[in-house]
Swiss-Prot record:
Its main location: cytoplasm. It comes from Homo sapiens. This is Evolutionarily conserved signaling intermediate in Toll pathway, mitochondrial. Ubiquitinated on Lys-372; leading to translocation in the nucleus together with RELA and NFKB1 and expression of NF-kappa-B-dependent genes. GO terms for biological process: cell surface receptor protein serine/threonine kinase signaling pathway; innate immune response; mitochondrial respiratory chain complex I assembly; regulation of oxidoreductase activity; regulation of protein complex stability; toll-like receptor 4 signaling pathway. Changing K372A: Complete loss of interaction with RELA and NFKB1 together with loss of NF-kappa-B-dependent gene expression. Belongs to the ECSIT family.
Length: 431
C-alpha cells in the first residue's frame, strides 16, 4: 500500500470516528449514524451528497412584513367642498404634520406637493414654499464632523431641498430671510441647498429686469384684451392704431344652428398704411399664419398681411441728408493706408423680407375669418380693394387667390390638419 492510499484511509476513518463520537454526545443511537466508508483513489465525488457535507448551509433571510404606504393622495382629496386653493393646500400640509409626528415619508409628500401646487394655484406663493421646507426635521441632517462635510450628508434629503428651490426658480419666486433660516436649521450652512440659495440671491436681482419688453405677471383673461396686449407687444411703432373688427358673441345670444362669431383684432401703423397705398396693384398681397406668440404661460396666434420683396431694379432708394443721419453725420473721404489683409465687410447675415402691412389676432384661423379682417382693412385702406389677396393659411392645402370684391367664401374643412400643416410649410419653404 502506497503512502497516498494510507493517508486517504486514515482520513476516512477519522471522519467516521468523529461522526460516531458526535452522535454519542448528542444522545443519538449509533445505528442511526450514516456509515462513512473510507474514500479511495478511484471513488467518485458524486457519492457524497450535499446533505452529508460538513459545511453548514447559510440560513435563509427572514422576510420582513411589507408596510402599506401612507396614502398621501387621499390627503389632497380631503378638502372640504372640493375647493383647490391656498387655504386647502396649507390645511393638507398641516394634516400631514399632525398625521406623522416623526415625519416619516416627508420626502415623498414634498415631491407630491410640488406636483400639486399648480392645481391649487400656489406655485408662485413664497409662504407655501416655506411651509414645505418646514416639514423637514430640524437639526437632523446637519453635518457633525469633517467627514460628513466632505461627503454628501443625507443626499436624498438634500436633493429634495434643491427640488423645492428649483421650482421656486422656475416660477420666479425670490427666497427671503425665512427661507434662508429654515435651510440653515435643516441642512446647515455648508450644504448644497444652501449653495443653491446663495446662487438664487446672486442672480435673481440681476436678471429680474433684464427684459426690455416686460410682460406683466397677471395677464388679462378676456381674449379681446389679451389680443390687444399681444399686438401692442409686437408692434414697435407707438403711433399704431388697434382696431376691433369683430367682438365674440356670448353663448346665450347664439343659437345651436348659428355659427360661432370669433373675435378679430388688428393693428396698423401710419407708415404701414402709407406703404400699402403705394403698393403696385398688379402684385398680390399675402395673408400668412397663424404664428405663435408666447406671453408667459399663454400662447396666442397672429396673422400678417405682407407682400413679396421688390426686385432690385424696382426699388426706390431714399437718400438721407447728412444733417439727418444720426449714425454718420458727416461723410469723410480719408485715404488711410490699409494692407491687403484688412477686411472691409462684416460677417452679418441679413435676410431681406417683404413689407408687412398689418397684423391681426382672431379667435379662428380659417379663410372666412381672415376675409372679414381684409374687409375691415378696406375701410381705412381703399387701395386694398384693387389688390389681389392670396391666403397662405397653415390649415389649408392650397393657396386660394381671390379678389377683394368676393372674399366671403365658406371655410375649408379641418380634416387631416397635421398633413396640411406639413404640406403648407413645405410650400412656404420652397417659395
Amino acid at each position: 500500500m502506497s503512502w497516498v492510499q494510507a493517508t486517504l484511509l486514515a482520513r476516512g476513518l477519522c471522519r467516521a470516528w468523529g461522526g460516531t463520537c458526535g452522535a454519542a454526545l448528542t444522545g443519538t443511537s449509533i445505528s442511526q449514524v450514516p456509515r462513512r466508508l473510507p474514500r479511495g483513489l478511484h471513488c467518485s465525488a458524486a457519492a457524497h451528497s450535499s446533505e452529508q457535507s460538513l459545511v453548514p448551509s447559510p440560513p435563509e433571510p427572514r422576510q420582513r412584513p411589507t408596510k402599506a404606504l401612507v396614502p398621501f393622495e387621499d390627503l389632497f382629496g380631503q378638502a372640504p367642498g372640493g375647493e383647490r386653493d391656498k387655504a386647502s393646500f396649507l390645511q393638507t400640509v398641516q394634516k400631514f404634520a399632525e398625521h406623522s409626528v416623526r415625519k416619516r415619508g416627508h420626502i415623498d409628500f414634498i415631491y407630491l406637493a410640488l406636483r400639486k401646487m399648480r392645481e391649487y394655484g400656489v406655485e408662485r406663493d413664497l409662504a407655501v414654499y416655506n411651509q414645505l421646507l418646514n416639514i423637514f426635521p430640524k437639526e437632523v441632517f446637519r453635518p457633525r464632523n469633517i467627514i460628513q462635510r466632505i461627503f454628501v450628508h443625507y443626499p436624498r434629503q438634500q436633493e429634495c431641498g434643491i427640488a423645492v428651490l428649483e421650482q421656486m426658480e422656475n416660477h420666479g419666486v425670490m427666497p427671503n430671510k425665512e427661507t434662508e433660516f429654515l435651510l440653515i436649521q435643516i441642512f446647515g450652512r455648508k450644504s448644497y441647498p444652501m449653495l443653491k440659495l446663495v446662487r438664487l440671491k446672486l442672480w435673481f436681482p440681476r436678471f429680474m429686469n433684464v427684459n426690455p419688453f416686460p410682460v406683466p405677471r397677471d395677464l388679462p383673461q378676456d381674449p379681446v384684451e389679451l389680443a390687444m396686449f399681444g399686438l401692442r407687444h409686437m408692434e414697435p411703432d407707438l403711433s399704431a392704431r388697434v382696431t376691433i373688427y369683430q367682438v365674440p358673441l356670448p353663448k346665450d345670444s347664439t343659437g345651436a344652428a348659428d355659427p360661432p362669431q370669433p373675435h378679430i383684432v388688428g393693428i396698423q401703423s401710419p407708415d404701414q398704411q402709407a406703404a400699402l397705398a403705394r403698393h403696385n396693384p398688379a402684385r398680390p398681397v399675402f395673408v400668412e399664419g397663424p404664428f405663435s406668440l408666447w406671453l408667459r404661460n399663454k400662447c396666442v396666434y397672429y396673422h400678417i398681411l405682407r407682400a413679396d420683396l421688390l426686385p432690385p431694379e424696382e426699388r426706390e432708394v431714399e437718400e438721407t441728408p447728412e444733417e439727418w443721419n444720426l449714425y454718420y453725420p458727416m461723410q469723410l473721404d480719408l485715404e488711410y493706408v490699409r494692407s491687403g489683409w484688412d477686411n472691409y465687410e462684416f460677417d452679418i447675415n441679413e435676410v431681406e423680407e417683404g413689407p408687412v402691412f398689418a397684423m391681426c389676432m382672431a379667435g379662428a384661423h380659417d379663410q372666412a375669418t381672415m376675409a372679414k379682417w381684409i374687409q375691415g382693412l378696406q375701410e381705412t385702406n381703399p387701395t386694398l380693394a384693387q389688390i389681389p389677396v392670396v391666403f397662405r393659411l397653415a390649415g389649408s392645402t392650397r393657396e386660394l387667390q381671390t379678389s377683394s370684391a368676393g372674399l366671403e367664401e365658406p371655410p375649408l374643412p379641418e380634416d387631416h390638419q397635421e398633413e396640411d400643416d406639413n404640406l403648407q410649410r413645405q410650400q412656404q419653404g420652397q417659395s
